[in-house]
Design a protein with these regions (language model features):
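A short, amphipathic beta-strand motif
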Residues: 562-568
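Outer-membrane beta-barrel channel domains
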Residues: 31-392, 397-409, 416, 535, ...
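Short, acidic Ser/Thr/Gly-rich low-complexity loop/linker segments typical of extracellular
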Residues: 582, 592-603
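Acidic carboxylate motifs that coordinate Ca2+ or other divalent cations, activating on Asp/Glu
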Residues: 573
């Protein structure tokens, strides 16, 4: 349908054509007919809600607060937990002292969820100094920092300690970096609020990274811990015969040198440490990378002695060997292959050769298929593999996948899965998944199971959003289980600055999948988890102010919202499918200045940010093993348009 202006323009042009016809020869060509050029309704972003822009204080630099209060109840097996919490997050920019933020929590709960506690963390980021120096400082509950070379390992990555204390990270634009941390170590506990629990003792860590030239850099770091609880007793569940929790002292040293050539990168690493006067344990590993026009090769060697650790935190140990991997990409083909040779130094750990390979062929813009496999030959042979086909239609993106695995106990598993991501409008995501699995045991017959799952997020107008996933499982046979688990979150913004959130989770007889063969650990059978449920009810108040337009991160170009999740990508396709779960308590930093943590379902959001390009940095410190983030997933660039809601799902993948 034409607009009034379009109709008027057509009438005027028609009249002009008629007048011209009367004065020109009859043979003159007729003027081309006018065509309206209308903006499609679906391409025009909605105007901002007047309620959102009213009474905004635009004086001063960007600043804001978020206050969240609520209650939560949990049940896990035979344990019941009751929680109440008050969380306060805030940020404010300064001209000369960098960007500041605060993260405070007042938590009350019974013994099943860690008891009562409180914590406050203050961050100062990008504080400028002369000669190209800047600093990030943290006071409160922080993770001890790791130097870039400590995080860049392809095969092995050092763990990081969480503590109540202080940390500082100084960087110079020429590549020099100096870090330090001191505090009391501890651990996170709680279902909805990740409350910190100190375990006593002291931890000190220092490190420095120095570039020697444009192609060479080195780093050295040391950690010392005194009178601390060992990592295997960190939860306080195990005690000595006298009822006292044993404590230890630990010291570790890390050193690395990296060389970067035109197409080759080489990094040598040394880790040495001891615990409570024991003998020094040493680890050496070498990582190399060669990048060609269409291929990328990773190769290395390692020798990691038994009981190797970084402080009291465990590191991969009791193995020696090497690995080689190659990734190739050309036109429609992507394939990779790798081999690991692993031997136990003590003779009591894992031994063997491991082979893996994967291939994907993009047959059409809308069609691709591929396969991958992992094989461990020998007396304790095992394998896993899958075939898949991906296609896109008007019904969205689809994947059909067949998986098969067998361990050394002649336990064979087979599973066929269909994943479907449905086409939706902006701010809506819906995916469904269906699978059928069978497990054959040499001693217990065959167990069959079927499952159906769905995951979605939906924006109901301007004030209500819904996010959740549901999975149903039915099985029969010796290990058959009837299972159900669901997670549903509802957010209602009932006033300009106020939001009410309700979340519910329930799980019955859920199982972990066995379709993984890892060179460093044994394969895992189906493991039934205890019945659990949880609910939470929260009310949130948010305040934004400052110039420009009360949004952090940009100029007065309008504002939008950014939300998303960090999830465990079980099938490695980079897309969050219905049966894949979120990663909780992961720090997400916006533009190096403003940070949030993912909730129990892996969700995060920045409710109002400047339009334009932004960078997200995801810190993998609290990811569960064996999951990790590659360089691309840990550093994400997103573009936010005015009045738009952008969603990004960040995939953590199993370590190779």
């Amino acid at each position: 349908m034409r607009t009034g202006a379009g109709v008027a323009a057509t009438f005027i042009l028609s009249l002009g054509g008629a007048v011209a016809t009367g004065s020109e020869p009859a043979s003159a060509p007729a003027a081309p007919a006018y065509q309206d050029r209308l903006i499609a309704t679906g391409d025009l972003a909605a105007l901002p809600n007047e309620q959102d822009t009213a009474d905004v204080d635009t004086s001063g630099l960007p600043r804001g607060w978020r206050v969240e209060a609520g209650v939560a109840d949990t049940h896990y097996g035979s344990l019941d937990g009751h929680e109440a919490g008050l969380a306060i997050d805030g940020f404010w920019d300064t001209l000369s002292w960098g960007s500041w933020s605060i993260d405070a929590l007042l938590h009350s709960g019974n013994s099943g969820d860690g008891g009562n506690g409180s914590s406050v963390t203050i961050w100062q980021r990008q504080m400028p100094f002369a000669d190209g120096w800047s600093a990030d400082n943290g006071l409160g509950v922080v993770n001890a920092p790791l130097l870039p070379l400590m995080r860049s390992g392809y095969r092995f990555t050092l763990p990081t300690s969480v503590m109540a204390g202080i940390e500082t990270d100084w960087r110079q634009q020429d590549g020099i970096e100096i870090q330090g941390a001191f505090g009391e170590p501890g651990f996170y506990q709680g279902s909805h609020w990740a409350d910190f629990h100190a375990t006593g003792g002291q931890l000190a860590q220092v490190g420095v990274q120095m570039p020697w030239s444009s192609s060479t850099s080195s780093s050295i770091a040391a950690i010392g811990e005194h009178d601390v609880v060992p990592w295997w007793l960190a939860s306080g569940q195990q005690v000595t015969a006298t009822g006292a929790i044993p404590r230890v002292d630990a010291q570790s040293l890390y050193a690395a040198t990296a060389w970067q050539g035109e197409d080759t990168q080489l990094q040598a690493n040394l880790l040495a440490g001891s615990m409570s006067g024991g003998s020094t344990r040493t680890g050496l590993w070498l990582d190399a990378q060669t990048v060609g026009e269409r291929y990328q090769q990773h190769y290395g060697a390692f020798r990691l002695e038994p009981d190797l650790s970084w402080g009291v935190l465990p590191f991969t140990s009791d193995i020696e060997g090497g690995y080689y991997r190659v990734d190739f990409q050309r036109a429609q083909w992507i394939w990779s292959a790798g081999v690991d040779e692993v031997r136990s130094i003590s003779g009591t750990g894992v031994d063997g050769s491991y082979f893996n390979g994967a291939a994907r062929y993009q047959a059409r813009p809308w069609l691709a298929f591929g396969a991958d496999a992992t094989l461990k030959p020998g007396s304790d042979s095992a394998y896993s593999g899958d075939l898949f086909v991906d296609w896109k239609t008007r019904w969205g993106s689809s994947r059909l996948q067949y998986q098969q695995a067998q361990d050394s106990a002649s336990r064979q598993s087979r599973q066929i899965t269909w994943d479907q991501s449905l086409p939706t409008r902006e701010n809506v995501h819906v995916s469904v998944s269906a699978s059928f699995a069978a497990v054959d045991s040499a001693y217990g017959g065959t167990t069959r199971s079927a499952s159906l799952a769905t995951y979605g997020s939906y924006q109901l107008g301007d004030t209500v959003s819904l996010d959740g996933n549901v999975r149903w499982t039915h099985g029969d046979g010796p290990e058959g289980q009837h299972g159900f688990d669901g997670n549903l979150g509802l957010n209602w913004r009932f006033a300009r600055a106020w939001t009410l959130s309700a979340n519910y989770y329930e799980s019955h007889a859920s199982q972990r999948s066995p379709f993984v063969i890892d060179p460093i650990s044994q394969s895992t059978p189906f493991v039934t988890l205890p019945t659990s449920w949880a609910y939470s009810l929260l009310i949130r108040y948010e305040f934004r102010a400052g110039s420009p337009a009360a949004v952090p991160g940009g100029n007065a170009s309008g504002a939008g919202a950014l939300a998303g999740s960090v999830f465990l990508d079980a099938n490695g396709d980079g897309r969050r499918d219905a049966a894949e779960t979120g990663a909780a308590n992961i720090t997400v930093i916006l533009d190096g200045r403003y940070s949030v943590r993912t909730d129990a379902s892996g969700r995060f959001d920045f409710s109002q940010i400047a339009a334009g390009e932004h960078r997200l940095k995801i810190l993998p410190d609290n990811l569960p093993l064996p999951w990790q983030l590659d360089e691309k997933a840990a550093n994400v660039v997103v573009v936010v348009k005015p009045r738009s809601d952008v969603r990004v799902d960040i995939a953590a993948k199993r370590s190779l």
